[in-house]
């Protein structure tokens, strides 16, 4: 199916879950994960990061998936949506009146007021975007695969150990232990908003709310992401969304990730419209890109949707991505792996 985006909305936010050592590699250190969403969208829109002088990289120096999104879908209009980021980006953005997510082991992740703001304003934004047609919705939230698992489990889904990781070595045992500790405070299963407030983060709710608004106002929502989008889809469904109108586009690296279960999660939530972008970086001359074939990064910042779109247009994806990576390496802002 040809799903051509009119706008690509990138929802950013942070969760203190990403500060737990070993749980997220979406940043060079746990502390730097709070800068990743802002840096991702600054680079995506401007071509260079602003808040710091380097694009987000893993601890091994593997570049952000925003590199791929910018390289292959640069002509698609982007809209940054701040659901609750600890660091606000130095680019224009829509603010949903949310807040950064807290560590759900210690107490509720979000206030009820922030969650209501995100739902109401995200839905209204989605409705306006939906009038334009097909809208891709991506995300940037380090720690998001853990909070996605937490949301799904809190809502009664069997998602234990089934979400992916930006690391080749998915820290599933750590994630499960963290989620179990948080669940001791609540009586699952919870209703959608309760699950987000207690065990979630601002981003998954915002993605669901925007998708809901898009579908309600005649548009076509495409969740551009991996296993995290199972949580967004579950919230969308739980809030009254029609799953027949929802689409999910992700990467081959997510679909083939044996440490997770992307298709299984889509199945238990009930998502039928799933698209896999079959791209390989195995032939790249750059180690930082070949690392994607060994399980690094996999998804994020709408990369799966961007690749799906680029392939539908017949683009030479690897050539475009290598050219952009070369530009960043020359500028000295692409980390320490080439």
Curated annotation (Swiss-Prot):
Disulfide-bonded cysteines: none
UniProt superkingdom: Archaea
GO molecular function: nicotinate-nucleotide-dimethylbenzimidazole phosphoribosyltransferase activity
Family label: Belongs to the UPF0284 family.
Name of the protein described by the UniProt record: UPF0284 protein PAE0372
């Amino acid at each position: 199916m040809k799903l051509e985006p009119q706008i690509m909305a990138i929802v950013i936010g942070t969760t203190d879950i990403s500060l737990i050592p070993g749980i997220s590699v979406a940043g060079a250190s746990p502390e730097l994960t709070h800068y990743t969403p802002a840096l991702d969208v600054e680079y995506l829109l401007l071509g260079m990061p602003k808040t710091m002088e380097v694009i987000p990289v893993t601890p091994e120096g593997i570049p952000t998936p925003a590199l791929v999104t910018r390289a292959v879908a640069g002509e698609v209009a982007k809209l940054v949506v701040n659901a609750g980021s600890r660091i606000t980006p130095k680019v224009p953005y829509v603010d949903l009146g949310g807040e950064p997510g807290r560590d759900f082991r210690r107490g509720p992740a979000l206030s009820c007021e922030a969650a209501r703001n995100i739902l109401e304003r995200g839905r209204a934004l989605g409705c306006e975007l939906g009038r334009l047609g097909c809208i891709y919705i991506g995300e940037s939230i380090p720690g998001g695969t853990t909070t996605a698992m937490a949301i799904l489990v809190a809502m009664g889904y069997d998602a234990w150990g089934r979400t992916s990781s930006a690391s080749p070595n998915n820290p599933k045992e750590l994630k499960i232990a963290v989620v179990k500790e948080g669940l001791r405070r609540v009586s699952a299963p919870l209703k959608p908003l309760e699950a987000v407030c207690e065990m979630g983060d601002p981003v998954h709710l915002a993605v669901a709310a925007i998708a809901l608004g898009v579908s309600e106002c005649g548009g076509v929502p495409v969740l551009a992401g991996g296993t995290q989008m199972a949580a967004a889809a579950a919230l969308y469904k739980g809030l009254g969304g029609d799953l027949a109108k929802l689409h999910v586009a992700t990467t081959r690296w997510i679909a083939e990730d044996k440490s997770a279960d992307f298709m299984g999660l889509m199945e238990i939530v009930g998502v039928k419209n799933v698209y896999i972008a079959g791209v390989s970086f195995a032939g790249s001359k750059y180690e930082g890109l070949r690392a994607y074939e060994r399980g690094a990064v996999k998804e994020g910042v709408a990369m799966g949707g961007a690749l799906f779109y680029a392939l539908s247009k017949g683009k030479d994806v690897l050539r475009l991505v290598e050219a952009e990576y070369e530009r960043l390496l020359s500028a000295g802002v692409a980390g320490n792996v080439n």
